[in-house]
């Protein structure tokens, strides 16, 4: 596959992912009653985000030590876990909708900036993750490293703040 086709596919896929998630968050009314399984999904999502963050950290440490096979395994694992997260996240919001934040006082001043930065960066990073992955899989390591220097810290931030948002929304209310 040529770079032009890959860029087109990455663009369409990124748009589709962001569009579906945005439509669910902004315009979808859940149509099914809650169940124990649905209620468990936010905790699962936080666990998937934490796993992704751990894999990203280990993968970064591995590449710094020139342990390329471990780096590759961790980064592919982070992609897989993030994909599972996306499926679980979309499923939860399709079935349950969004949960309003009920915290007050200083907690609101902490929660909303974290939430906004998490949402904006999560949406913006989709094409960067896909491009970084594509460049690694095609052996274009010079350009892979160049974009990964940006992608990794943003992806790590999004993964960690996903856990923080969960804790603030479901545990520290």
Model regions and ranges:
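Alpha-helical membrane insertion/targeting regions
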Residues: 1-173
């Amino acid at each position: 596959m040529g770079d032009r086709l890959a860029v087109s596919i990455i663009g369409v896929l990124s748009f589709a992912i962001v569009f579906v998630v945005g439509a669910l968050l902004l315009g979808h009314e859940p149509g099914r009653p809650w169940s124990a399984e649905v209620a468990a999904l936010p905790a699962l999502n936080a666990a998937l985000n934490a796993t992704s963050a751990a894999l990203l950290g280990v993968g970064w440490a591995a590449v710094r030590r020139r342990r390329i096979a471990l780096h590759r395994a961790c980064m592919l694992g982070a992609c897989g876990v993030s994909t599972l997260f996306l499926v679980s996240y979309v499923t939860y919001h399709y079935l349950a909708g969004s949960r309003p934040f009920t915290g007050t006082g200083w907690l609101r001043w902490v929660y909303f900036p974290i939430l906004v930065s998490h949402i904006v960066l999560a949406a913006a990073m989709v094409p960067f993750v896909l491009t970084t992955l594509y460049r690694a899989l095609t052996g274009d390591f010079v350009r892979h490293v160049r974009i990964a220097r940006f992608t990794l810290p943003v992806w790590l931030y999004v993964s960690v703040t996903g856990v923080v948002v969960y804790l603030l929304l479901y545990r520290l209310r």
